[in-house]
Each structure stands twice: as structure tokens, then as C-alpha cells.
Amino acid sequence: GPVRVRENGESIPFYVHGRSCLTGAGDTDRTLDMLSRGENLKGMVPSSDMSKHLPAKAVRRLKRLSRMVLSLGISACAGKREGNLPRAIFFGTRWGALSETHDFLAKLFETDERLSSPTDFIGSVHNAPAGQAAIHFHAPGPNITITGCNGSFEQALFSAGLLCGEDPFLLVGADEYNEHLSPLFDPEASSAERATDGGGALYLKRKKEGAT
């Protein structure tokens, strides 16, 4: 059935035209297979699964969360032709791009707060991954990143209901694990065996025709 958002007391349906996920198990097919067998999905997303749909330039240039979000978006929109791609991006994340944040701060402290990487600075802001997805899909509409703890994905969906109009859009929720910062934000992530990250994406439209 459709994903529904309430607006002014009215239920608005969005239909799923594409989906993808990345977990410790791997890509969507591996994740669904393990779920069907009741197996645990913990662990970090394998780099091979995260990078296999990406252009080589993106693999070289992007770090973990931006790579994850772009991979999720490309997989969710697989087979879609130009003119039938998302025109808006809505991204929910709790912690944002931890790899770039750590690397920017580490280099800054190493140089007595004099120098660091402009690339890491740009990549460290929360909306950088959604920006990469918008650039890839040439999405001219709203590009919104929501940070609301465990409700980030839900809030991103609500934002889409308010802002997207009739345009198709990409809804993504993802977070990365970083060995330096994740344990500081979440004490339960302090041991390597609990290191877990991943995300999911839905390509949504108000039109039912062609929905999965």
C-alpha cells in the first residue's frame, strides 16, 4: 500500500516506485533474505555493496555517508529514465557526515587550528549527502535535510508532504558509524562488535501507476 502523510487533517498517499537499503548484511536483496530467515542485520555496510552502483569518480571523492546516500538513491531509482527521476531530495539523519567531521577537526587540531581540508569542511555539514544526490539526479526542487534524533526519517517524510507538491521525490534515511565519534554520541556503540550503520531510500510519487 501507499505511504501516507497527514496534512491539514487529510491523509495524502505517496506510492513507492523504487526502494533500496544498505545494512550490515549488504544490499537490498541480501538484507531481505536475512530478514526472511530471522537473522541479525548488525554490522557496518560492506564497502563493496556501498560502491558497486557508483561512478568511479564518486567512489574516489566521497566519504562514507555521502557515498551511502548516493548509492541508496541510485539503487532506488534504478531503471528510471531522464524525465522520470526525482525532482526533490528529503534526507533524514541523526548524526550526519561523521567521517568528514572527524577528519576536518583532526587536521585542524594537528595544525594548531591553522589549516584543514576545505573538502572535509564542505562534506561535514549535514546536508552535504543530500546535495550530492541532488547534483547526481539534477533535482531542481527542494533539497531538505532533517535531523531529529530517532525521528529524522519520519520528519523528512512529513517535510516532503508539505513541500514536494506533485513532483516525484527521493526519501532517504541513513547514518554512518565512525570509530572515533560514534561512541561519544552513543555509549552503546563503544565496542567494535556493536559498530553498525546503514540506511534506506524510497522513490515516491503521488501517482499510483507503475508503483511497486
Q: Where are these predicted regions, by residue range?
A:
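Conserved "HGTGT" condensation-loop signature of ketosynthase/thiolase-family condensing enzymes
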Residues: 1-142, 148-154, 162-168, 174-212
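Short-chain dehydrogenase/reductase
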Residues: 157
